[in-house]
């Protein structure tokens, strides 16, 4: 729900920017708030009919099962866009600081990730199952991909949502796609996912 809420707030701002003629030149911005509305209505994270994770079906197949056809349609619809910002849900509960995750970052992509102005950028090496994710397939199709983890999934957090919206608008402004005033944000700390260690408590409680 958090990701859908962020997209709705982002669209509200982008409509005003477009109305004032502040989308620069011939730039186009596409926002896809949700690709599985029925699943959300039932409070499910995966595809409602067969519990499939859509983010494991890319690049999709136009002649495949329904989820695979949806994945294919997303790839076709976003083909040719220079940048792609994915707001993935997270498979674990809890909250965390909003951050950008890069998969096998190419030269310069970390610098671009810093333009979001979030506290952290995580560099990760792709694993075999990443080959079927939206992020990986965008990259293979020539789209600079960023995964923006927004700090919450199943619930709505206004403060974290506002931070995510601001970071996207900041990136679009700094890339010369829109004209919009925003504060400078953070200078990101760049971390390698392989250097992170889980810390487990030995007992319940504080």
What are these regions (language model features)?
Residues 1-206:
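Structured catalytic-domain cores with a bias toward divalent-metal coordination
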């Amino acid at each position: 729900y958090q990701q859908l809420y962020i997209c709705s707030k982002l669209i509200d701002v982008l409509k005003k920017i477009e109305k004032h003629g502040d989308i620069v030149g011939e730039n186009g911005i596409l926002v896809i708030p949700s690709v599985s509305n029925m699943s959300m209505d039932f409070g499910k994270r995966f595809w409602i009919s067969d519990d499939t994770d859509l983010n494991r079906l890319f690049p999709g197949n136009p002649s495949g099962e329904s989820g695979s056809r949806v994945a294919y349609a997303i790839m076709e619809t976003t083909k040719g866009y220079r940048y792609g910002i994915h707001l993935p849900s997270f498979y674990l509960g809890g909250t965390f600081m909003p951050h950008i995750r890069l998969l096998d970052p190419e030269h310069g992509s970390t610098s671009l990730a810093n333009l979001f102005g979030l506290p952290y950028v995580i560099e990760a090496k792709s694993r075999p199952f990443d080959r079927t994710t939206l992020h990986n397939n965008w990259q293979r199709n020539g789209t600079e991909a960023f995964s923006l983890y927004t700090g919450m999934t199943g619930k709505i957090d206004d403060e974290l949502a506002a931070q995510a919206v601001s970071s996207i608008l900041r990136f679009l402004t700094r890339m010369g796609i829109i004209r919009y005033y925003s504060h400078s944000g953070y200078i990101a700390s760049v971390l390698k996912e392989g250097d992170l260690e889980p810390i487990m408590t030995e007992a319940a409680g504080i």
